[in-house]
Structures are given as C-alpha cells and as structure tokens.
Swiss-Prot record:
It comes from Homo sapiens (Human). Interacts with ANKS1B. Interacts with SMN1 (via Tudor domain). Interacts (via C-terminus) with AK6. Interacts with WRAP53/TCAB1. Interacts with HMBOX1. Interacts with PSME3; the interaction is inhibited by PSME3IP1. Interacts wit UBL5. The modification Phosphoserine is found at residues 105, 184, 248, 250, 256, 271-272, 301, 403, 487, 489, 566. One of its GO terms (molecular function) is U1 snRNA binding. This is Coilin.
Length: 576
C-alpha cells in the first residue's frame, strides 16, 4: 500500500459554516491519497462543516481559484485556503473554449448551431426570390427611361394641351347651358314668390268683394255664401300653417291670417246689421247643420251674430265645445299643440257677443280684453309652443276634464263666456329648457389630477452576502421558500425578510419571524383544512402559510442572505 500523504490545511471561511457557527478559521488534515482532484477536497469540506449537498464551494489559494477538475496535489502542507460560497448559476453547464476566455452554455450552443443550419437551408431561396424581384423592378425602370424620348415627350405635351383646351371649351358650354337651365326655374320661383309676398291679401280682398256683390244681388243666400267662404278660408289657412316651406313663408302666412279674419268679421257684422230680418227668416235646422259641419271641419265654431235666435246660439255653442274637446284630445304631441295654437290664433277675435265687439290681431301676445261689453278674453298666437295662461270657457259645466284649461266659470248660457282663472302650463318645455341650459351653462376647463401612490422601490437582495449557515439569534435575513401560491401550485416565493428567533445546531431547525408583509386573509379554499373546537370556534389550517412565525430546516431556505443595516440607521434608532 502507498504511504499516506497527509497535508495540514488552514481554511478561512467568509461566514461561519453551519457546523460551527461561532468561528470562521479552521485547520483540516487531508489525506491526498483519498482526494484525487480538487472536487474531492471540496466535497470533504462540505461534509465536515455541515454544508448542504447543493452548496457550491470555491477554493482560493493566495487569491487564485483552484479549478475543480485539477489535481489535489496543488495543495501543499500548511497552505491557507479561502473557502467561498459561490453563486449557483455561474458554473452550471459551462463549456470552456480553447482560449478559456468565453463561457458558453451547451443549450445556447446547440440552439445557435440549429439556427445556423436552418438559415443555410432557407436563405438561398429567399435571396433568390428577393434578387429576382429587384432585378425585375430595375429592368422595368430602365425600359421606361429608355422609351421616353424627347420627341415623344413633346408630342405628349402638345396632345395634352389640345385635350385640355377642348375639354375646357366643352365644359364651359355645358356649364353655361346647365346654369341657364338651373337659373330659369329658380328665377320663375323667385318671381312667383315675390308676387305672392307682395300681394298676400289680394285673394282674400277679392273674396270679400265677391261676397259683398253676391250679398247685394241675392240677400237670401248671403249667409250660406259667407259660411262657404269661411270654410274655404279656414282650409287655406290651416294648410298654409301645416306645411311652411321656410321662415319667410310662415311670416307672410301669419300676416295674411292676422289681417284676413278681421276683415271677414267686419263684413259679417255689417251684413248682419243690415239684414237681420232676412237671416232670421231662414230655418233653424239648416243653420244648425251648417254650424255643426263647420265646427267638425275646422275644430272651432264662429260665434253667432246678434240677429240669430237663442236656440241657434245654444246649439252652435254646444257643438263648438264638443269640437274643442276633440281638438284638444288630438293635440297631445308637441306638433299637434303647435297646430292647435295656430288655429286658435286664426279665429281669435271673430264674432263676439255684445255690440261693442272689436277685432283682434293674431300677432298680439298674451291676453287682451276685446271690449267693454264683450267681457271675453282671446288668446294671442305666440311663436313659442307654450299654451296661453288660461284657455277656459265657462259653459256651466261642472266637470274639469282638462287641468290645463282654466277653472270654468258659470256664465249665462248664450250671453257671455266665463273668465277662466289663469293656470300656467307648458306643453313642450324640453327644447326651451335645453336651450336655456345650454345658454346658462358655464364651460369650465377643470382638470383633476389623479396621483398613484408612490411605489416603494424594491430592495436588491442580490447585493447582500450569502449565508452558508444560520447567523446569530436576532439577525435579520432575506430568504426564499418553496411554497404554494394562491392557485395551489408550488413555486419559489419572492425574497422574504425575517428575524432569527432561535437556532438548534443539532437539528438545524430555525425559528424565523417573518417581517415582510403577509398575504391578505381570505376564505378557506379547497386545500385548506377547517377544524371545529368544542366551543364551536373554527380553526383554519391554510395550505398557503398565513402565520408570521415559521419553523423550518436551514436547508429548506433558498438563497439565505444577511441583511446588514447601515450605521446611519443604527445610530438613528439608538436613543440619544
């Protein structure tokens, strides 16, 4: 057998080893016959001083690293070796190239080689296709340049100029014709419109004159003719009100309507004063039927004149009240309400009971008294959609079917109409309110600043020194643990800060108080155990640790590092 070659080595640790946490310098007697390479020496040191099997140790002799694959004969007697706990990912799967300068991983080298092979297979086709297309484009461009000669260029410019001139001449002729065609109907329409605007009263004046002539020639048929004329006039005015083409047309119609009824009422009053006997000779049945027809068509009845009997006035008043109810029921929508107001403005101020009747114009706003003896109020046609203040008519009826009508007074039947108390009501206030709000709204350029809470910068624990063994009690350490995540899958946690409460060197168990933030408490899941005590209280054993104190083996800690507090912090914490 070969003689044993024992060597005495002095080992210097950066941090106390797990087996002897109170010292960092040791003497070790090594038999070189048992240690063939430096790796054997490292495994011997790992075994003697309680390092875990996964801990990678590096041996340095006078500042130089002893390669793991070198012979252990490099170590001589009384040599001082520095033992350093290296990072794990430094020397895993490393390939040293001949120069020794570059360290490449096997996986990366394989991937690069595979990519190079694929590139060599696919590149020729791609390059050929790109070159092919580029050469094609270059050839086409060269051909185009060669084909363009100066003569051809001059010919093309001349032909283009001629074409442009021809197009311009044709375009001007066509445009002139089209403009003439367009202007001619427009001019005609404008002329007709101007004529109508200048003479809005001419057809009505003619109708009144014809009516007067017919009255003189045939006095008996004057009442019927007047009713027919009134029907025609009402239909024309309603049609013109329902379909206005523009604002100017509507204004002209308003003027004609405001002037027309007053003239018709004057003529009717004169005729009634001159021929009271002839009108009274007619049968009441015919008058009732004509009044009813007129009320159904127009929705409003003309008030009877002085010469008519009390029976005719009562029948016409009843029919007018019924027609008013029908018209008001149909005017639920804003458009119907607008049409209703316009028709009210048409017949405002026509026939009124009493000798002192005065005509009213439809453009008058609000309410006006018609006369001293009349005692009635007529609504003026207002441009807005809102209804007048009081639209009530007192006919002795006790029921108030429409709340927006005024409270009905009790007047003598056939004599005067009761004055309704003004009750303000607006049918369509939405558009007016919107406009008012838009005008009254004050635009404010106010910006609210939303600031996120200041994120605390994460500590870089990789700069802290690694721990080979458990430090002293009371020291703070940073470590990782293999634990279940919130989805109950095992994973390495982030760095946690903890304080060493106790350490057992024999069992290598460590009690650690976790100082970092714990996860928020939640309801127990499917992997959490719930126990019931005798008193009925529930005890939950979470699969994911929720406690601030843990007891683990030192080997279970991943990358334990010592947290070194700066002297400024320690001095500030100490009492002055």
């Amino acid at each position: 057998m070969a003689a044993s070659e024992t060597v005495r080595l002095r080992l210097q640790f950066d941090y106390p080893p797990p087996a002897t946490p109170h010292c960092t310098a040791f003497w070790l007697l090594v038999d070189l016959n048992r240690c063939r390479v430096v790796t054997d020496l490292i495994s011997l040191i790992r075994q003697r001083f309680g390092f875990s099997s996964g801990a990678f140790l590096g041996l340095y002799l006078e500042g130089g690293l002893l390669p793991p694959a070198e012979s252990a004969r490099l170590v001589r007697d009384n040599d001082c070796l520095r033992v350093k706990l290296e990072e794990r990912g430094v020397a895993e799967n490393s390939v040293v190239i001949s120069n020794g300068d570059i360290n490449l991983s096997l996986r990366k080298a394989k991937k690069r080689a595979f990519q190079l092979e694929e590139g060599e297979e696919t590149e020729p086709d791609c390059k050929y296709s790109k070159k092919h297309w580029k050469s094609r484009e270059n050839n086409n461009n060269n051909e185009k340049v060669l084909d363009l000669e100066p003569k051809a260029v001059t010919d093309q410019t001349v032909s283009k100029k001629n074409k442009r001139k021809n197009k311009a001449t044709c375009g001007t002729v066509g445009d002139d014709n089209e403009e003439a065609k367009r202007k001619s109907p427009k001019k005609k329409e404008k002329c007709e419109y101007k004529k109508k605007a200048k003479n809005p009263k001419s057809p009505k004046v003619q109708a009144v004159k014809d009516w007067a002539n017919q009255r003189c020639s045939s006095p008996k048929g004057s009442a019927r003719n007047s009713l027919v004329k009134a029907k025609r006039k009402g239909s024309v005015s309603v049609c013109s009100k329902e379909s206005p083409s523009s604002s100017s047309e509507s204004e002209s119609c308003d003027e004609s309507i405001s002037d027309g009824p007053s003239k018709v009422t004057l003529e009717a009053r004169n005729s009634s004063e001159k021929l009271p006997t002839e009108l009274s000779k007619e049968e009441p049945s015919t008058k009732n039927t004509t009044a009813d027809k007129l009320a159904i068509k127009l929705g409003f009845s003309l008030t009877p004149s002085k010469g008519k009997t009390s029976g005719t006035t009562s029948s016409s008043s009843d029919s007018s009240a019924e027609s008013d109810d029908q018209c008001l029921m149909s005017s639920s929508t804003p458009e119907c309400a607008a049409g209703f107001l316009k028709t009210v403005g048409l017949f405002a101020g026509r026939g009124r009971p009493g000798p002192g009747l005065s005509s009213q114009t439809a453009g008058a706003a609000g309410w006006r008294r018609s006369g001293s003896n009349g005692g009635g109020q007529a609504p003026g046609a207002s441009p807005s959609v809102s209804l007048p203040a009081s639209l009530g008519r007192g006919w002795g009826r006790e029921e108030n079917l429409f709340s927006w009508k005024g409270a009905k007074g009790r007047g003598m039947r056939g004599r005067g109409r009761g004055r309704g108390h003004p009750v303000s009501c607006v049918v369509n206030r939405s558009t007016d309110n919107q406009r008012q709000q838009q005008l009254n709204d004050v635009v404010k350029n106010s910006s609210t600043i939303i600031q996120n809470p200041v994120e605390t910068p994460k500590k870089d624990y990789s700069l802290l020194p690694l721990l080979a063994a458990a430090p002293q009690v009371g020291e703070k350490i940073a470590f990782k643990l293999l634990e279940l995540t919130s989805s109950y899958s095992p994973d390495v946690s982030d760095y946690k800060e903890g304080r060493i409460l106790s350490h057992n060197p024999e069992t290598q168990q460590v009690d650690i108080e976790i100082l970092s933030s714990l996860p928020a408490l939640r309801e127990p899941g499917k992997f959490d155990l719930v126990y019931h005590n005798e008193n009925g209280a529930e005890v939950v054993e979470y699969a994911v640790t929720q406690e601030s104190k843990i007891t683990v083996f030192w080997k279970e800690l991943i990358d334990p590092r010592l947290i070194i507090e700066s002297p400024s912090n320690t001095s500030s914490t100490e009492p002055a």
